Structures are given as C-alpha cells and as structure tokens.
Amino acid sequence: MDNKLTHFDNKGNAVMVDVSNKNETERIAIATGTVKASSETIELIKSGQIGKGDVLGVARVAGIMAMKNTSNLIPMCHPVMITGSSIDFEIDSEKNEIRITATSKVVHKTGVEMEALTGVSIAALTIYDMCKAVDKRMVIGDIHLVKKLGGKSGEFNF
C-alpha cells in the first residue's frame, strides 16, 4: 500500500492532484451504506405513507444528483463527466434497515470512488430528512467503498 498522501505538496499545502499525464480508462466504483429506522418507519416507507412522498424515489434522484456534483462538495475532487450512475435500495424488515448501493461509471483520468460515496451519503440523508417527522432515532452508517475497477491502482474489493 502506498502511504503517500497525494493531496499535499512538499510544503504540506493542499493541492488538487495533477492527472494530466494519466490515461483515460473506464472506471467503476460501488459504495454502500445503511439507514436503520424503527419498524414502523420501515413499513411507512414500504407502503408509501410518508407524508413528504415517495421516500426512495426522491432519495434515488438526490443520490444521482449528488454524484454529478461531488466536485462542488469535496474540495480536491476532480470534476468528471459521469457516464453512468445508479442508486439501489434493499429493505431488510428483519433488521429494520435500508441498504443503499451507489454505482458510478466514468471514462476519465481519475476514479469515481468519491462520487459513489457521496451518492450513498446524500441518499441516506434524504431518507432521514423525509422521515424525521416520524422517526428522529434513525441511524445512518456503514458507508464504505465496496468495489473499484480501473485506473493505475487496479481493482479493489472490500
């Protein structure tokens, strides 16, 4: 593992990494996270009875929009032209949780890990926002990169 932090120059100042000499390749990143909620909240989401509307539909759009705007949120993240993105949900009624999975694809000189992680994070925050009137004890967690393909560092699997 390379322990060199790439977002700092030799004086310790923050910099955006220069990717101009890197090759454009297809890159894919998959991230995941969860929202734990009460069983009542999970049932309200499943039955479409949350007052603010279609929770997962809105969270899906919010997550995709977030992926497209990641470089505006994370200072040293390069703007990339995303070629594909998706947000998927899996409701586990036994665990009272919603698992969010974000996939981001690009043909570029830099990866899309931050885009996938941002998509999961914003989708989770959107679920919280839409359900907080009925459940303030929701817990957002377990957000992490699951898989990365492409680029100089190759494949990563969690």
Curated annotation (Swiss-Prot):
Its EC number is 4.6.1.17. SUPFAM superfamilies: Molybdenum cofactor biosynthesis protein C, MoaC (SSF55040). Substrate binds at M76, C77, H78, M114, E115. Pathway: Cofactor biosynthesis; molybdopterin biosynthesis. It is an enzyme of class 4 (lyase). Signal peptide: none annotated. It catalyses: (8S)-3',8-cyclo-7,8-dihydroguanosine 5'-triphosphate = cyclic pyranopterin phosphate + diphosphate. The keyword Secreted does not apply. The active site is at D129. InterPro entries: MoaC, MoaC_bact/euk, MoaC_sf, MoCo_biosynth_MoaA/MoaC, Mopterin_CF_biosynth-C_dom. GO terms for biological process: Mo-molybdopterin cofactor biosynthetic process. Keywords: Lyase, Molybdenum cofactor biosynthesis. One of its GO terms (molecular function) is cyclic pyranopterin monophosphate synthase activity. Homohexamer; trimer of dimers. Belongs to the MoaC family. Catalyzes the conversion of (8S)-3',8-cyclo-7,8-dihydroguanosine 5'-triphosphate to cyclic pyranopterin monophosphate (cPMP). This is Cyclic pyranopterin monophosphate synthase. The lineage of its organism: Bacteria, Bacillati, Bacillota, Clostridia, Eubacteriales.
